[in-house]
Curated annotation (Swiss-Prot):
GO molecular function list: ubiquitin ligase complex scaffold activity; ubiquitin protein ligase binding
Role: Core component of multiple cullin-RING-based SCF (SKP1-CUL1-F-box protein) E3 ubiquitin-protein ligase complexes, which mediate the ubiquitination of proteins involved in cell cycle progression, signal transduction and transcription. SCF complexes and ARIH1 collaborate in tandem to mediate ubiquitination of target proteins. In the SCF complex, serves as a rigid scaffold that organizes the SKP1-F-box protein and RBX1 subunits. May contribute to catalysis through positioning of the substrate and the ubiquitin-conjugating enzyme.
Sequence similarity: Belongs to the cullin family.
Keyword terms of this UniProt record: Host-virus interaction, Isopeptide bond, Methylation, Ubl conjugation, Ubl conjugation pathway
Domain characteristics, as noted in the entry: The Cullin neddylation domain restrains the RING domain of RBX1 in the E3 ubiquitin-protein ligase complex; this restraint is removed upon neddylation of the cullin.
InterPro entries documented for this protein: Cullin, Cullin_CS, Cullin_homology, Cullin_homology_sf, Cullin_N, Cullin_neddylation_domain, Cullin_repeat-like_dom_sf, WH-like_DNA-bd_sf
Gene: Cul1
Pathway noted in the entry: Protein modification; protein ubiquitination
Annotated source species: Mus musculus
Modification(s) after translation: Neddylated; which enhances the ubiquitination activity of SCF. Neddylation prevents binding of the inhibitor CAND1. Neddylation leads to structural rearrangment in the complex that allows interaction between the E2 ubiquitin-conjugating enzyme and the acceptor ubiquitin. Deneddylated via its interaction with the COP9 signalosome (CSN) complex. (Microbial infection) Deneddylated by murine cytomegalovirus M48 leading to a S-phase-like environment that is required for efficient replication of the viral genome.
UniProt-listed GO biological process terms: animal organ morphogenesis; apoptotic process; cell population proliferation; positive regulation of canonical NF-kappaB signal transduction; protein K48-linked ubiquitination; protein monoubiquitination; SCF-dependent proteasomal ubiquitin-dependent protein catabolic process; ubiquitin-dependent protein catabolic process
Protein name per its UniProtKB record: Cullin-1
Annotated Cullin neddylation domain residues: 706-766
Length: 776
């Protein structure tokens, strides 16, 4: 007797697929036609699947006729009730295929938005229904499907994935071209400014993404994007390239580059938003690269030409826009950096040339001109170029070039003119004057000075001139502010190190020590016989101060006692130390009793010595003054010129032009008893012109000598470490080591090498061209 339901020996039921399929298919049909379903009905369908999968079948029935059993992972051929499911799987697959084949008929003739509406709506419905079906078949998924996949059988999927695969094969592939073309048309409409239904595109994209199943692992999480990339993205990117190639070419033909940049900026932003609104995020980088290539890279030459125009016209906003665009291209900024460097260099040269000869003798004008150029382009680099390191470097190179070599340095025939003028500008800032700025403003100005200092190649020249001027300010007690002096030295120390400022700091220390010494000397005088005049000194350590020893001079008798008392006092405190008096730097005050008014004259020691002679006589020849003061004739002539111009002394012919008269030994110089001045306190201690010129020449000479010593020291250091070195390598290392202080000239380095060979620090290696070895 035959029956579809019979008991096996173990008492388990055997349920045939035909018994449940009609009702199951009706339920599935209900799901895919989006009819409402009660929970009880859903459970009935689930139970059908469960009962079938757990019924007892023979292994060949479970797998299906003609399907060879697959090996398990342990090499066994399993069989049994827990593996029933193939026949059900086949029928589900067939159902989905038939459903989609019929559905395709409704959409295969549709185009443009109609096909998109059809595709996205059907996809949403199908996807939802398939998830419901997946739930009904949960037991089948967990057991039979899982086992088949574990066994490595191809073409078996979870039921939801099976639904996607069937959609891909039966509906997506036939409609793919129509749908993709419709999407691309819609995107082009949006690019042309039309409003579109973006949900249609996002629906298609979401479908394409989900259809990218992992064929090798049915249970893998997340799509592979294969379908999306191959069926949509590649065509979308090609379309994008075509669209923007045409648009950019046409736009540039009809509009200025500045307007094109705004357009390109807007388009790049649009495409970025496009991805955010309805494309897959993985498209972002590829799309950006494609747009940048078409909108920017293909037009770089036009950008480069326009960059120069924008610099000339100071169009900072447009320059910033160009930077933002071109910075998207790999190595795209190189040409812009070169153009900026050349432009700043030319602007700097032009600005200094415009000042003309005036800047040669006006440190403030010169430095301010340099700072104005730097300030302008530093602001540009910060605002338009985002303080990009490459553009900062371009600014630095350009400033270094025009500051160290320009119209002023050419007029002076010396690249050392810039550091000298900068040092003189510092002197004008730090010296007492009626125009001294407030402390905060002065600090800010000193910071600006350091901006220029950074670009100075010959920092040793600056140091020499700065040291000389600082020394004078300290000796003449002419500093506007001790705090400002200390601040500037601190800035220089930070920029160049301790060694660079060590002498400057020792000068400060000497001034402090001298103050204490004066107090001690005054105390000493109160305990003995006091002097009949106010006397103070400054004792300076000879190695730290940039002063030459004094020339011959006979101290006036009025000062002799003070001189002797202090010399004895100092010797009692510091045995073995020798004092060398710097009369040319000394000064004092004379009170007059020979004129209608009583004047206080602030005079140099040389001026005092000459004027004090007139306490005994009203007139002297130049020779007599030379004999009594022991001042050399060339210096005496300069001192007398100043006294004659101030009208304290006059020539025998009182109406003679002082500048035109040559002072000879027999020239008579008289005290002018009719001297008048609006001020009762008169400063006649002004620097002598020839003294200034001589000092400048001496400074430059000292710089050259110091450089030779520094170069020799660097060569010895390098050779001591390297032992043997080729000529070119040695030159390179010397230049590198000394570049922070100055730029050594190659002929001078060669000369220093020869000097060291003569001194037997080095020798040339026999048989090897241009090679030196160190002699310990």
């Amino acid at each position: 007797m035959s029956s579809n339901r019979s008991q096996n020996p173990h008492g388990l039921k055997q349920i045939g697929l035909d018994q449940i399929w009609d009702d199951l298919r009706a339920g599935i049909q209900q799901v895919y036609t989006r009819q409402s379903m009660a929970k009880s009905r859903y459970m009935e369908l689930y139970t059908h699947v469960y009962n079938y999968c757990t019924s007892v079948h023979q292994s060949n029935q479970a797998r299906g006729a003609g399907v060879p059993p697959s090996k398990s992972k342990k090499g066994q051929t399993p069989g049994g009730a827990q593996f029933v499911g193939l026949e059900l799987y086949k029928r589900l697959k067939e159902f989905l295929k038939n459903y989609l084949t019929n559905l395709l008929k409704d959409g295969e003739d549709l185009m443009d938005e109609s096909v998109l509406k059809f595709y996205t709506q059907q996809w949403e419905d199908y996807r939802f229904s398939s998830k419901v079906l997946n739930g009904i078949c949960a037991y089948l998924n967990r057991h039979w499907v899982r086992r088949e996949c574990d066994e490595g059988r191809k073409g078996i999927y979870e039921i939801y994935s099976l639904a996607l695969v069937t959609w891909r094969d039966c509906l997506f592939r036939p409609l793919n071209k129509q749908v993709t073309n419709a999407v691309l048309k819609l995107i082009e409409k949006e690019r042309n400014g039309e409003t579109i239904n973006t949900r249609l595109i996002s629906g298609v994209v979401q479908s394409y993404v989900e259809l990218g199943l992992n064929e090798d692992d049915a249970f893998a999480k997340g799509p592979t994007l294969t379908v999306y990339k191959e069926s949509f993205e590649s065509q979308f990117l090609a379309d994008t390239e075509r669209f923007y190639t045409r648009e950019s070419t046409e736009f540039l033909q009809q509009n200025p580059v500045t307007e094109y940049m705004k357009k390109a900026e807007a388009r790049l932003l649009e495409e970025q938003r496009r991805v955010q609104v309805y494309l897959h995020e993985s498209t972002q980088d590829e799309l950006a690269r494609k747009c940048e290539q078409v909108l920017i890279e293909k037009h770089l030459e036009i950008f480069h030409t326009e960059f120069q125009n924008l610099l000339d016209a100071d169009k900072n906003e447009d320059l910033g826009r160009m930077y933002n665009l071109v910075s998207r291209i790999q190595d795209g900024l190189g040409e812009l950096k070169k153009l900026l460097e050349t432009h700043i260099h030319n602007q700097g040269l032009a600005a200094i040339e415009k000042c003309g000869e005036a800047a040669l003798n006006d440190p403030k004008m010169y430095v301010q001109t340099v700072l104005d150029v730097h300030k302008k382009y530093n602001a540009l680099v910060m605002s338009a170029f985002n303080n990009d390191a490459g553009f900062v470097a371009a600014l630095d190179k350009a400033c270094g070039r025009f500051i160290n070599n320009n119209a002023v340095t050419k007029m002076a025939q010396s690249s050392s003119k810039s550091p000298e003028l900068l040092a003189r500008y510092c002197d004008s800032l730090l010296k007492k004057s009626s125009k001294n700025p407030e402390e905060a403003e002065l600090e800010d100005t000193l910071n600006q000075v350091m901006v220029v200092f950074k670009y100075i190649e010959d920092k040793d020249v600056f140091q020499k001139f700065y040291a000389k001027m600082l020394a004078k300010r300290l000796v003449h007690q002419n500093s506007a502010s001790d705090d400002a002096e200390a601040s500037m030295i601190s800035k220089l120390k930070q920029a160049c190190g301790f060694e660079y400022t060590s002498k400057l700091q020792r000068m400060f220390q000497d001034i402090g020590v001298s103050k204490d010494l004066n107090e001690q000397f005054k105390k000493h005088l109160t305990n003995s016989e006091p002097l009949d005049l106010d006397f103070s000194i400054q004792v300076l350590s000879s190695g730290s101060w940039p002063f030459q020893q004094s020339c011959t001079f006979a101290l006036p008798s009025e000062l002799e006692r003070s001189y002797q008392r202090f010399t004895a006092f100092y010797a009692s405190r510091h045995s073995g130390r020798k004092l060398t008096w710097l009369y040319q730097l000394s000064k004092g005050e004379l009170v007059t009793n020979c004129f209608k008014n009583r004047y206080t004259l602030q005079a140099s020691t040389f001026q005092m010595a000459i004027l004090l002679q007139y306490n005994t006589e009203d007139a002297y020849t130049v020779q007599q003054l030379t004999d009594s003061t022991q001042i050399k004739m060339d210096i005496l002539a300069q001192v007398l010129q100043i006294l004659l111009k101030s009208k304290l002394l006059v020539l025998e012919d009182e109406n003679a032009n002082v500048d035109e008269v040559e002072l000879k030994p027999d020239t008579l110089i008289k005290l002018y008893l009719g001297y008048k001045n609006k001020k009762l306190r008169v400063n006649i201690n002004v620097p002598m012109k020839t003294e200034q010129k001589q000092e400048q020449e001496t400074t430059h000479k000292n710089i050259e000598e110091d450089r030779k010593l520094l170069i020799q020291a660097a060569i010895v250091r390098i050779m001591k470490m390297r032992k043997v070195l080729k000529h070119q390598q040695l030159l390179g290392e010397v230049l590198t080591q000394l570049s922070s202080r100055f730029k050594p000239r190659v002929p001078v380095i060669k000369k220093c090498i020869d000097i060291l060979i003569e001194k037997e620090y080095l020798e040339r290696v026999d048989g090897e061209k241009d090679t030196y070895s160190y002699l310990a």
